[in-house]
Amino acid sequence: MAARNGKNSILEKWRIDEKPVKIDKWDGAAVKNSLDDAAKKVLIEKYGYLESFNLVDGRLFICTVSCLFTIVALIWDYLHPFPESKPVLACCVVSYFIMMGILTLYTSYKEKNIFLVAMQKDPAGMDPDHSWCLSSSLKRFDDQYTLRMSFTDGKTKQSRETEFTKSVSVFFDENGTLVMDQYEKYVSKLHDTLATEKKTK
């Protein structure tokens, strides 16, 4: 009973600390970003998962290497004025565009629409961490928002996912304020569905 009361008090505090999010209902990017941020908040603050930045770090690494090529080109051209610097400049330009191509492939096939990777630590510290991913989509001039949640078992490496698609009007009132309690129910349902499947297998 005490454990249950403790859990309820944590959830209650999480709801009390929640501040209303108000956006322009006609701004699709703002709508999507606010829903994404709210879903992220549920996994991190309600369930206590730790955000992993490996996916973002990969993109930053590619961008950093691309910038290094441009810096090398500038320095080399300063030290060895054109046309002496022509071979190095050509090499840097080609390398830069190759890195941009790699970045495009990375964002398209690796990142996709993922905006959160969260790790669920094993309480005993014996098994590998479980991974939870959130991705979403909201087409331009469309009100149908899709939230996908995937779970990867750290031990078996098996993955499962589930999703919902709802009109954004379900989660915002007439003033453009996010109804967090309503949205939380949908996000928590996705999580609990995957968590239940995890326990039964």
UniProtKB/Swiss-Prot annotation:
Task: Determine if Transmembrane is one of this entry's keywords.
Answer: yes
- Provide the transmembrane region boundaries: 60-80, 87-107
Q: Where is this protein localized, as stated in its record?
A: Endoplasmic reticulum membrane
Q: Which GO terms describe its cellular component?
A: signal peptidase complex
Give the top-rank taxon of the lineage listed in the UniProt record for this protein: Eukaryota
Instruction: Spell out which residues lie on the membrane's Lumenal side.
Output: 81-86
Any Pfam family matching the protein: SPC25
Q: Which ranges of this chain reside in the Cytoplasmic compartment per its record?
A: 1-59, 108-201
Q: Which UniProt keywords apply?
A: Endoplasmic reticulum, Membrane, Transmembrane, Transmembrane helix
- This protein's record includes keyword Repeat: no
GO terms classed as biological process: protein targeting to ER; signal peptide processing
Membrane topology, as annotated, equals: Multi-pass membrane protein
InterPro entries according to UniProt? Spc2/SPCS2
What's this protein's family per the entry?
Belongs to the SPCS2 family.
Q: What does this protein do?
A: Component of the signal peptidase complex (SPC) which catalyzes the cleavage of N-terminal signal sequences from nascent proteins as they are translocated into the lumen of the endoplasmic reticulum. Enhances the enzymatic activity of SPC and facilitates the interactions between different components of the translocation site.
The subunit field of the Swiss-Prot or TrEMBL record says: Component of the signal peptidase complex (SPC) composed of a catalytic subunit sec11a and three accessory subunits spcs1, spcs2 and spcs3. The complex induces a local thinning of the ER membrane which is used to measure the length of the signal peptide (SP) h-region of protein substrates. This ensures the selectivity of the complex towards h-regions shorter than 18-20 amino acids.
Protein name per UniProt: Signal peptidase complex subunit 2
Q: Which organism is it from?
A: Danio rerio
Q: What is the lineage of its organism?
A: Eukaryota, Metazoa, Chordata, Craniata, Vertebrata
Its gene?
spcs2
